[in-house]
């Protein structure tokens, strides 16, 4: 595996490749990330991964400085997955001058849920993903369903900007107790880690209720927020939305069996966890 930080060198290395499969990450790789590499290999060759902690998608009071950076560990894991190139640029490589041009997602998708609680987050994501796509020029790129809203925004962005890349969705990988794998899980104390699976269990109960015929979604959402708050969580949102556009379904859509997803974000101690479950 070649480890490359220069955009120029990356383009030289990939020149002539027309089936590249790309997996962008921020590093601190876990089994969830590695499953993306394996899925990428099913859809293209060679597989290129990137590791870049993107300052543009962090707010002023978020965890950019303490976000775990484990490059040598990550390199060893990617080598075992037979990744062809790891693109690991420095901030100077990616942003040699102030990034004045940004890619702004529409408010109807980028300004809700995560976008409401993390202003500017999706602008940072869209900007860096567009730039990474321009550097790697993949045929396919793999994104995890764990970041459901991000997946939808990136897919729509590629369609609307006519980027010649297919976005492949990867299923969320979970620990045995149901907790969705995340680099931020390492922030949890032992007690918090024991409590953390309750978020997934709460979403599962919502799913079962909706499939069982409960159509009062507001009641389900409020009960879930109250339940988690009573266990020491601080929920940002728990919301049942249409999979197609993350808009809340109306009664007719519920009756017609509209495909739904319940999405959630909540703090446990100082750690903010997100999760979702398709219904």
UniProtKB/Swiss-Prot annotation:
It catalyses: (R)-pantoate + beta-alanine + ATP = (R)-pantothenate + AMP + diphosphate + H(+). InterPro entries: Cyt_trans-like, Pantoate_ligase, Pantoate_ligase_C, Rossmann-like_a/b/a_fold. (R)-pantoate binds at residues 57, 150. The keyword Acyltransferase does not apply. ATP binds at residues 26-33, 144-147, 173, 181-184. Pfam families: Pantoate_ligase. GO terms for biological process: pantothenate biosynthetic process. The active site is at 33 (proton donor). Keywords: ATP-binding, Cytoplasm, Ligase, Nucleotide-binding, Pantothenate biosynthesis. Pathway: Cofactor biosynthesis; (R)-pantothenate biosynthesis; (R)-pantothenate from (R)-pantoate and beta-alanine: step 1/1. GO terms for molecular function: ATP binding; pantoate-beta-alanine ligase activity. It is found in: Cytoplasm. Beta-alanine binds at residue 57. Disulfide bonds: none annotated. GO terms for cellular component: cytosol. Its EC number is 6.3.2.1. Homodimer. Belongs to the pantothenate synthetase family. The reaction proceeds by a bi uni uni bi ping pong mechanism. Catalyzes the condensation of pantoate with beta-alanine in an ATP-dependent reaction via a pantoyl-adenylate intermediate. NCBIfam families: cyt_tran_rel, panC. This is Pantothenate synthetase. The gene is panC.
């Amino acid at each position: 595996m070649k480890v490359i930080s220069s955009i120029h060198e990356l383009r030289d290395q990939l020149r002539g490749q027309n089936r590249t499969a790309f997996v962008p990450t921020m590093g601190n790789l876990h089994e969830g990330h590695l499953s993306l590499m394996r899925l990428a290999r099913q859809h293209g060759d060679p597989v290129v991964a990137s590791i870049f902690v993107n300052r543009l998608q962090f707010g002023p009071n978020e965890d950019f400085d303490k976000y775990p950076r484990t490059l040598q560990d990550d390199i060893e894991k990617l080598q075992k997955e037979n990744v062809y190139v790891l693109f690991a640029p420095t901030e100077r490589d990616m942003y040699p001058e102030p990034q004045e041009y940004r890619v702004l997602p529409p408010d109807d998708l980028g300004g809700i849920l995560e976008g409401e609680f993390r202003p500017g987050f999706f602008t940072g994501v869209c900007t860096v993903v567009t730039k990474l796509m321009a550097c790697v020029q993949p045929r396919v790129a793999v994104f995890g369903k764990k970041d459901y809203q991000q997946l939808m925004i990136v897919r729509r962005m590629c369609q609307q900007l006519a980027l010649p890349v297919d976005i492949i969705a990867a299923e969320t990988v979970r620990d045995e107790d149901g907790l969705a794998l995340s680099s931020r899980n390492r922030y949890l104390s032992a007690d918090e880690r024991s409590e953390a699976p309750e978020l997934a269990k709460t979403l599962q109960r919502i799913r079962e209720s909706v499939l069982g015929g409960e159509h009062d979604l507001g009641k389900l959402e409020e009960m879930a927020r109250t339940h988690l708050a009573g266990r020491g969580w601080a929920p940002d949102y728990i919301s049942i939305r249409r999979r197609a556009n993350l808009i809340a379904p109306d009664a007719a859509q519920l009756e017609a069996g509209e495909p739904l997803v319940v999405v959630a974000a909540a703090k446990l101690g100082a750690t903010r966890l997100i999760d979702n479950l398709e219904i």
